[in-house]
Amino acid sequence: MQTSKYLLATERDAEWGLTISTVGREEIVPGEEYPTKGHADGYYFDIKKGRTLDEYQLLYQPEGEGVFSSAHLPETKIKAGDIFLLFPGEWHSYHPSSTKGWKSYWIGFKGKNINDRVKAGFLSPEKPIYHVGYS
């Protein structure tokens, strides 16, 4: 089941330096088709071909497991308690394990504030996965 919200930002909103474009959650049960139908145009992707976005997205997986790959990272296992960051213009693909599924929460965002953090080296496409745990 997927619940998501896509938000439209105005030029005035962008003056804050960070705008939110999407938030949501999804639970994929073992054996369920992925990606699920219902993604907005520009977000749906074929896991074999991957995609690029024009925003950052932070995804948190509190349950299950799967894999993630990007232009800077070969296929890497994602496990419960991991977060991973998608970078604008960076090719990527990910999907849950067909035998375990996963729960996922995400937020999409963009703006000068996050761009500055990346330029300063706080975040990098070479190291997009962090294990933060779960409760």
Feature names for model-found ranges:
Residues 1-76, 98:
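Generic protein-terminus/edge-of-domain signal
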